[in-house]
Amino acid sequence: MVPNEKSFPRGGTIHSEVKTDDVSLNIVFGASQKKVKKAPKVKENLLSYETEEQNGQLEAFSAETLNMDTLQEDMLVMGVVKELTATALQIALPGRMFARTLVADISDAYTRVAKAAMSGDTSEYHDLTELFQLGRIVYGKAIKTEKLDTGRVSLLLSLKPADVHGNLHHKSIKKGFIFSGAVAEALEHGYVIESGVQGLQAFVPCEKPAQKLHVGQLAFLKVKTVHHDTHQSTCTCVQVEQDQLRIKSQNETNLDYILPGSIVKFKVAKHLKDGLKGSIMNESFSAYVNEHHLANALDTLDAYELNEDYNARVLYVMPLTKLVYLTLNLDIKTGAAVAKDQDEEEQEVEPIKVGSVVEKAKVLRLGSGGVVLLLNKKLKGIISYGSIRGNFKGNYDKDEVLSKYGRKTKHKVRILGYDVIESLYYCSDDPNVVNEKLFCLEDINAGDLVTAKIFKKDDKIKGWSVRIGKVNGILEQFYLAPNVRYDVGQSLKCRVLEVNAERKICYVSNRAEYLGKGIKILTDYASAHVGNVYMGTVVRCEDTYVLVKFGNGIKGVLHRQNLKENSSFFEGQTTKFRILTRNKDQITLTLPEDKFQLGEICPVEITNALDAGLEVKITFAAEDDEEDEDGNPKLEEFVGLIPLRLLSDHLELLHAQMRVHPAGSYTDAACIMQNIFSLRDVPYFSGQLTKDWQSVQVGDIIRSYVKHATDQVVDLMVCVRNYNKPVKVHVKMLRLNAVKNAPVELVPEQLLWVKVLSKEVETKTLTVSAKLTDVWSGDLSDTAKLVEGYLNEVAQIKAGLEEASAPISKYSVGEKINVVFKGIDATTNDWVYTVEGNGKVSALLLSSLVGTAKAPEMGSKHEAVILWIEYSSDVLLISNKKLDIAHISPSGELSTNLIGKAGMKAKVLLKLESVAVCSLKKGTNPLVICPIRLHPNDIENSGSAELRQGDFCNIAFIHDKLHIAVPETVWRLWRGVKRTAGTEVAPVKAKKAKVEESPKQKKTTIEETSAQKKVKAKAKVETKTEAKAIPTKRKAEVVEKITNGQKKTQPLTNGIVKEKPKQNGKLFFEDKTPAKNAKSETPKSNGAEGKSRLPGVSSFWEDDVNQSKEGSSDEDEELNVAETQKNAAKKKRLSAKEKAKAEIKEEQRLREIEERNADPKARLETIDQYERLVIAQPNNSISWLKYIAFLLSNTEIEKARALARRAISTISFRETQELRNMWSALLNMELVYSNNFDDVLKEALNCNDPLEIYISVVDILKKNKRKDRLSSVLTTVLNKFKTELRVWPVAAEAYFWLGKSDQVHNLLQRALRALPNQEHIPCIVSFAKLYAKHDNNDMAQTLLDDVVTSYPKRIDIWSVYVDMLIKAGLIDSARNVLERAVVQKLKPNKMQVIYKKYLQLEENHGTDATVAKVKQQAEQWVKNYAKTVK
């Protein structure tokens, strides 16, 4: 306790009546717990502290030790290094307090060296463990800091000489002065010392070769010689050890120059109740020694005789009273060495570990600050009064509490810690502390099962801080059990994974995988035997390896090349791993044997929903037939993953499937490999036996999925057991060129079917083909089943959402609803609505359906019809057009008159990822669903190549119950592939067509028919012009040749059957749409052949007789040809009047086409229109960009890329800006859709101004959010073009976008160093605008204020400054700037600008009075200027 200072009032000393406070500042005992002043008592009270003045001299009658209340700010205190790390020291202070010292608090020289080390120069850097040792005595300035979150006060101790010696003056330095200095510079002949004393230069010569100090290191120094001057003094010093810091009594008379840690002579004058009172420096200063600071810990006060001198070390000096507090313990030891302080003859006592329990601790006395104990007969301990008081709540009696601590009584205590200055152990007898099993880290081992209690959320690790008994723990994000709600105060059963002694913390996990019985945890390298299986957690996933973490921080690497199968991993995945090899602390892992085989269908429980997919758990009986405690069969749990792509065959249903499979739900999943399962493959594996290597035969069609895909080769994993090799398929072998330059996009886990071409038994390899014609028969009924499965999956998702009471599940496709308009999406221009009566469900009207319509008013209500439902995002895709509302009805079965019908006119309303939604033009019908792909291997989307959103097309139905259709051209193409030659007159299904004649007779008949047709058609051909060759309607025609019960298709060419080539020929040709009045030159049918048949023969082989009776556009081609010939004959005999009308009609048609093409405002919808646009404006980059955007909207990436190249070669080289626009577009495409960005960038830099290209690249990378690439580009730009002014604002803007706003100011300094002086002002102004743009108005004002101060005549800067302040709403600041501007001495034209700006400000934001004031000031300035001119 600090003694109260005596006041010295003017007029002499008034001796007041002596009063005593019976109040303890450390502990309050008694029933009332109030501080009450009482009269002094005769009997001695060991718990009360007398702090009175008994006489006229300034003195204290208590040698109380230091505490947080008596410790004053900036007070110099001695400390001892108790713990140290590379970057911080923990220092023990008097009073059992602790302080921390950081790197920046050592010395200015060490701070400089540390900064250099951070920049890469580590030549002079040594961490704190090299500069300090445990037990090292230091002194420094104490600084109190309060933590904002807890309010607790902690201490920092600054050892910097400038802070410690800042109040000393160089003229007062004498020979023999001892201080702590830092090495500022190491020279050949000695060290320059950083003393911190004003005006003092210190130097230490290298007298001893073994002496080696580092720059920044602190050392105790003693002044050997000193030379004083008026403004500066120099001294030579020698280094001394901490046990040689003695100061002679006659040397120093100023207490400020006796620094803590110094050794002085202490003369005992009086025994106090809690220590010794005496004096130092020949009785010049009063000094005190607390009873806990005696030479030996167990010494008593009676051992020190009065008027005797003892060596003592200065602990601290109270700043106001100048009372000195000392310790007689000169040889301060750490806890490990405390037991060796006994006599040599006595046996050494083992030190007590912190956290251990002492069963019989004997009470010696009630001392100052607590109950003094004797531990293990030789060591000293103390139970603080605060600890005793904490055991009681409410009122209690002091005497009763302390009565149990009578002399020689014994107590069971736990060691809490050791104080190196007082040489004692501080303890606790609290039963909760003593009986706690888990008190310190030594009580916990990795692998233990413990109960942890959550006490705080840790956002840094995205986990929780927990407490296990009295030990702190961390529950990291990777080790959190999924689907568990966490709250502060919650208790969790956890497994200890790591015990970190350095951080004094342990890491735990409550995942079910770690809590299972019999789980093996790898906790030390000695147990890591090859072949053992341990539970581990994936902490990092890379392309070539997976990093796995076990217990106690042990890590292992799982190389993907060591895996037999392509296993998928994700960060946080916890599973078992087998040790493959170990080399010291390097562990290589592999996976244990598979629990499940390929195709095995298992009941799984969804445990967690991840970004990568669904985490599942499978529970099954253990293989060793063990039983649990209740006698039930022991169960094992296996954890796996269903990747996102394996939830469904259709991309748009993946996230919807995740919604209907929440955590805790159960379902069936098929094993694909090791721990990877699939939902989409369950129907396939449940419907047939899974093939293995022995059962695979050439010709089999097998399911597979993409493992890896490049532009050239695709790696496929086939679903064959015991065959783990990927099979390679060339991308060109997948294409049929059904759509020219159609992009091929293959992603991992994508489904493909393959046909086995060969099987090599010796090498155990399969050769396969994934070409569409190899794996698909061309039967459109298979396509119909594919779409039917898609619709069934959508229905299942809807049913699952209905069970979860999701609002979106109430709606159906084709249903009419009322919606409320909410606005237009700025990115997609789609119209956004909400459903009336259900605000949780939003509706979307796509911009392609909006057309040129004007947006309605906000909040207006409209009627709409649902076109499709996006269950993954709770969005209804709607149409508000009256025709769609009238023509669309809810879903139902297909009417009988539409079964198999073709040529129906329909409008494409939506084009989704898997299907296109169409509406029939006539009548009220449900929506028609068209597949995007005819088959999973239809990678070119040939089934929907002609479908464009918003266009009309002809469709043909391919399902007999559902509204499923394909474009008519696709239907005719694949129908023609299937028909035989004998049934060409009328379409016949292939399975029921029976031809009795032999192949040879069949060929003869066809040739005869062809010859007859040629003769009959010869006259007609000669009468017509031969300038045009009109193609037939059919793209390809084949004849089915029946041999030994098997069908073989062979193409027909001019009526002659050709041999089928060995390889499959192209089924698609890029022909234009057939003309309506096409003239057939093939021998398949003609008018004469139709007449030679008996009635009904044409439909004899057909299944559906009604098909031949329908008079729609799906009639047979033979009938169309006959009608065409008759119509052609009639047209030859047109009258003159009919010819004139036909010419007029044709002229009108051509005029309409020309007007439409000439209208610049017309919406471009076809490639021909865009071609005309770019031909008309070849140097206009906007036209080319519109064309490219049109192609990209149709996912024709290659065409768009080629068009950009074509534009670059077409635009004139003089149009540099237009060319730059095209290069920017090409770079943007390569960045988004390809991986050739760097190559295209090099090409662009060679063909354009590099600076312009780099600036465009920065914008492109920002728009595409490529932060990593942007940083490297900025580095390149700033190095290459640092003398260009334009570069720096662009880089600053990018820094703001990257979130590096703190580095913008450094960037400005770099810019000013690199740019010439004349460009400094524009650069500063640009940066100021950027600061203002990003709401950092203070920095912007600072920059502009400096400019206008230095260059007051720059009117443009004044204007920018004022405009910026007005825009930020800082009107008063803008007014102050203008008031500064108008007092400048400027020319009239410049002053006119200033006053106009001033007047405009007051008119807009001021009052009439301020406006009048500005006008008056302007008039006055004009008058004054006129006088000066005269």
UniProtKB/Swiss-Prot annotation:
Repeat listed as a keyword: yes
Gene3D superfamilies noted in UniProt: Nucleic acid-binding proteins, Tetratricopeptide repeat domain
Residue ranges, compositional bias (Polar residues): 1043-1053
CDD domains for the chain: S1_Rrp5_repeat_hs1_sc1
Cross-referenced SMART domains: HAT, S1
UniProt key word Repeat: yes
UniProt subcellular location: Nucleus, Nucleolus
Source organism superkingdom: Eukaryota
Keywords (A to Z) from UniProt: Coiled coil, Nucleus, Repeat, Ribosome biogenesis, rRNA processing
Start-end of each HAT repeat: 1161-1193, 1195-1232, 1265-1297, 1299-1333, 1335-1367, 1369-1404
Main location: nucleus
Biased composition (Basic and acidic residues): 1057-1082, 1135-1145
GO terms for MF: RNA binding
GO cellular component annotations of the record: nucleolus; nucleus; small-subunit processome
Gene Ontology BP terms: regulation of alternative mRNA splicing, via spliceosome; rRNA processing
Ranges for region Disordered: 1041-1145
Coiled-coil stretches noted in the UniProt entry, renumbered to this chain: 1119-1157
Free-text disruption phenotype from the record: Lethal in 2nd instar larval stage. Enlarged nucleoli in larval salivary gland cells.
Domain S1 motif per the UniProt entry, residue ranges: 74-160, 176-238, 261-329, 447-511, 531-592, 697-771
Function: Involved in rRNA processing or maturation during ribosome biogenesis.
Name of the molecule in the record: rRNA biogenesis protein RRP5
Protein's organism: Drosophila melanogaster (Fruit fly)
